Amino acid sequence: MNGFAVIPSVTTTTTSGEPIAGDVARKQNLLELNREGLERFFENVLGEKRYRAHQVMKWIHHRYVSDFEQMTDVGKALRARLQACAEVRVPCVVFDKHSADGTHKWLLAMDTDSKNAIETVYIPDKGRGTLCVSSQIGCGLNCTFCSTATQGFNRNLTTAEIIGQVWVAARHLGNVPHQQRRLTNVVMMGMGEPLMNFDNVVRAMSVMRDDLGYGLSNKRVTLSTSGLVPMIDRLSTESDVSLAVSLHAPNDKLREQLVPLNKKYPIAELMASCERYLSVNRKRDSVTFEYTLMKGVNDKQEHAHELVKLMRQFDCAMQVKGAAKVNLIPFNPFPGTYYERSTEVDIRAFQKILLDAQILAMVRRTRGDDIDAACGQLKGQVVDRTRRQAEFRRTIEDRVGRDVAA
């Protein structure tokens, strides 16, 4: 278990993440706070100067120390007060798996009984290391090609549980911000829809980008969404991280089958919200559109030509060539799915149509599929509050029954 103890989660912050002054009966998890929240906690609860908060924040996020007694440049009296009213509570590592290609996956327990757990994935590459972080236990959406969707939904993760994934991974990797950086990028592409957990995700991303936290630049933190249009608009006013959109289809009819959220926010509205996002965040010059290729579903040449038209319209609206970038993702199978991965020939043919039209299109190399850590394969352990798990099991049983009868 790597020495990470699980303690029942308690809330000692307001909905905005501010510490509740004077509430020392319950310990404040300092991972729940960004720099501003930690400064307020030290001023209002501990009666200390703000620079003390900065000292502790560095101990937590630069040196991965969770025991106040080990924070040697913090006075003994202050350490004692911190022990009485605060803690650094991190997720518990249930197991970790290594892929043959270097990918690393952790199953992290969020509750004392380990019935709820999420998955976090580290993907090393030449000159970079990317951490794929989860935002929910399960997912409230029901995308038909995603393993997480089959698990149903339990709840949103807290800020501490989100940034705790980064803490666990960075500690394991021996990451040293500003020096020996093993973790160079974070993508909010794990379990869950990040924009359905807006406040906690935005607060966690602020710690990722803070020099007292993990020191990542805005462009190295990417949020991926299935297309919650109002929340994309809100994100544009509260953060300027890189934006990725799970598109997966070039027209509404097909996208509604793959991403049911499209019935509420169709492609035209989604693309308009992406235009507004770039208009507000002038530092960002592009949006990445993710497109999972499934055999015979969305990988035909006519789909590629439709996608070209959609991407060109976006570039034209932004008056920037290359404002739309396409990330082609070969489908990663999971038990019970009826989708199949497109052939390599079809994937390359699809990409060529985009490239010939001068649309930047990359094919994402599949990583970690031997440990079910590839895109779309994460599922964790979810105590489902919906009926989706049971419905998925019945679907599989019915399919197996038909196959046996045949």
UniProtKB/Swiss-Prot annotation:
Give the organism, scientific name: Xylella fastidiosa (strain 9a5c)
Q: Report the transmembrane regions from the record.
A: none
**InterPro entries hit by this protein:** Aldolase_TIM, Methyltransferase_A, RlmN_N, RNA_MTrfase_RlmN, rRNA_lsu_MTrfase_RlmN/Cfr, rSAM
For this entry, the protein name equals Dual-specificity RNA methyltransferase RlmN
Question: What gene name is listed for this protein?
Answer: rlmN
What are the record's GO terms for cellular component? cytoplasm
Q: Where does [4Fe-4S] cluster bind?
A: 139, 143, 146
Q: What does this protein do?
A: Specifically methylates position 2 of adenine 2503 in 23S rRNA and position 2 of adenine 37 in tRNAs. m2A2503 modification seems to play a crucial role in the proofreading step occurring at the peptidyl transferase center and thus would serve to optimize ribosomal fidelity.
* Gene Ontology biological-process annotations: rRNA base methylation; tRNA methylation
